């Protein structure tokens, strides 16, 4: 494995949606998530991490060191079993730990070495937690917050029709079937994230190669994830703040506050990324540099 990163990073993701549903709320009939007090749209951190995982899985195709632990419809025990088989562990995990007190660390290192998303985001590995192993919970160096739209959004419920009929009985009664879908006409969303070099060194071994793949995955996370429900989505810009040290040279909030998004003059209802201007206030704190990608 490559050496762990030595620098802390904080970053801002700007992405937009046009005539789509960026993240449906199952508790609200799959309506786009909205902050009820402000009317601003929300996208969960879990949703964004899923996009990143999907991109890595697609681009790396299960290459050694880049497997994905959290997969759709795949039991986690299958991946857990690979670690136990590699280490020759059979039967009761508590008994195995008594025989080998270093078993916790060995399992954790195997999982971090082989699964990119554990190395990046961490994981709760239930099999090992139930076996009373300390390696069952791994805290990852990369963390994301919820994305929030820059301006309030107004979700619309669109009625659609289908010419196909489901059953023979329905065919005798009606000629079409009705359906509904939610869309956001336009919304620019902002998400903020963190990369801890300290956790990378102490826990998962997240490397410079992993970091480069993370930036690539963020920039392209919607490019291979198209669907009729999501409409037109794109990452417009990734703004990265690099610290000259492991623990950082400035509080993250000061760097995030430096990223300012304003509506252009005369724009009352934004319908395009071109309706906004994005700036990074300077000078930045000493020991911090900014890289803008996208």
Please identify what each model-predicted range represents:
Residues 1-294:
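RNA-binding basic/glycine-rich loop and surface signature characteristic of RAMP-family CRISPR effectors
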């Amino acid at each position: 494995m490559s050496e762990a990163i030595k620098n802390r990073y904080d970053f801002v993701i700007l992405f937009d949606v046009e005539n789509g549903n960026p993240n449906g709320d199952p508790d609200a009939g799959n309506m786009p998530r909205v902050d009820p007090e402000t009317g601003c749209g929300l996208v969960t951190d879990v949703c964004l991490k899923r996009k990143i995982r999907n991109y890595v899985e697609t681009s790396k195709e299960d290459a050694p060191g880049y497997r994905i632990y959290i997969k759709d419809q795949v039991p986690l025990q299958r991946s857990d079993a690979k670690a136990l088989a590699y280490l020759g562990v059979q039967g009761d995990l508590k008994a195995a730990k008594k025989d080998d007190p270093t078993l916790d660390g060995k399992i954790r290192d195997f999982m971090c070495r082989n699964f990119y998303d554990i190395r990046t985001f961490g994981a709760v590995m239930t099999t090992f937690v139930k076996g009373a192993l300390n390696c069952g919970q791994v805290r990852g160096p990369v963390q994301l917050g919820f994305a929030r739209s820059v301006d309030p959004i107004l979700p619309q419920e669109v009625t659609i029709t289908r010419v196909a009929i489901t059953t023979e009985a329905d065919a005798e009664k009606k000629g079409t079937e009705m359906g509904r879908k939610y869309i956001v006409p336009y919304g620019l969303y902002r998400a903020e994230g963190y990369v801890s070099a300290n956790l990378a060194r102490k826990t998962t071994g997240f490397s410079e190669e992993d970091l480069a793949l993370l930036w690539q995955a963020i920039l392209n996370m919607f490019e291979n994830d198209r669907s009729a429900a999501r409409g037109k989505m794109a990452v417009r810009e990734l703004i990265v703040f690099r610290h000259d040290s492991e623990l950082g040279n400035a509080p993250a909030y000061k760097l995030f506050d430096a990223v300012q998004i304003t509506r252009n003059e005369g724009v009352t209802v934004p319908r395009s990324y071109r309706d906004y201007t994005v700036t990074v206030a300077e000078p930045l704190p000493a020991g911090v540099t900014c890289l803008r990608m996208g």
